[in-house]
Design a protein with these regions (language model features):
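Conserved ABC ATPase "signature" region
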Residues: 96, 100, 106-123
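Helix-to-loop junction immediately C-terminal to a conserved catalytic motif
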Residues: 48
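H-loop/switch region of ABC-family ATPase nucleotide-binding domains
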Residues: 187-188
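Catalytic Walker B motif of ABC-type/P-loop ATPase nucleotide-binding domains
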Residues: 152-155
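Conserved ABC transporter NBD signature motif
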Residues: 56-64, 72
Length: 237
């Protein structure tokens, strides 16, 4: 579904990503761990075709995403940290606006179905400024459902959520994978990573220091391995 090869990104003299390579098949999830400034968000933006790499190659669904980004963007669902919702609109109005902007089907029945899938149908007419962090995250994921995305890119989906909220995101990702979706999740959550990921990646100083099957890592081993690999690593701006 997605293959990144030797992705590099520089800003002037600063090297942000240094030869990142990985591949995921349909229905797989990569959890990307790393300290603040490791390059996780930059990598997600490259995968979303929002940034161009300085060097490297990227294929999504067999398409050269760097040459033809417009062909792969309809396949992508991007939920950034903070979710980018419109606080003064209701949940339903947010979805209607997003679908109208992308030229999608903004019919009331379709919007209601998406809100029901993320358990927000009961608050469809409430303004988003009253929502918790978890509810805003779910609203962002409703956009993914409406867009019928096949590759989901999530930046810190567990941050600011309580245990119930983290469990809900895990269940959403498992269902997304079961339906054939592929996901890359940038996170600080060890537990969340092992709960949904097929592969665990650890990013440090712009390099992928580890890429291993999640099944090979225990809940006790992963934090120790993370600390040993990232200890003393300076954050990449």
């Amino acid at each position: 579904m997605i293959a990144a090869q030797d992705l590099r990104k520089t800003y002037g003299p600063t090297l942000v990503l240094d030869g990142v390579s990985f591949a995921l098949a349909r229905g797989q999830c990569l959890a990307l761990l790393g300290p603040n400034g490791a390059g996780k968000t930059t990598l997600l933006r490259l995968l979303a075709t929002l940034l161009r790499p300085t060097a490297g190659a990227l294929q999504i669904a067999g398409v050269d995403a760097l040459r033809e980004p417009e062909r792969v963007r309809p396949l992508l669902g991007v939920v950034a940290h903070g979710s980018y919702v419109y606080e003064d609109l209701t949940a339903g109005e947010n979805l209607r606006f997003w679908e109208t902007m992308r030229g999608g089907d903004a019919s009331p029945a379709r919007l209601a179905a998406a809100l029901a899938q993320v358990e927000l149908d009961a608050v469809a007419e409430e303004r988003v400024r009253t929502f918790s962090a978890g509810m805003k995250r779910r609203l962002g994921l409703a956009r993914v459902l409406l867009a019928e995305a096949r590759l989901l890119l999530l930046d810190e989906p567990f941050t600011g959520l309580d245990r119930r909220g983290r469990k809900w995101v895990n269940e959403f990702l498992l269902a997304f994978k079961a339906g054939g979706g592929t996901a890359v999740v940038a996170t600080h959550s060890f537990g969340g990573s092992l709960g949904v990921a097929d592969r665990i990646g650890i990013l440090g100083q712009g390099r992928l220091l580890l890429d291993r099957p999640a099944a090979d890592l225990s809940p006790e081993e992963l934090p120790r391995l993370y600390e040993s690999l990232t200890e003393g690593a300076e954050a990449t701006p």
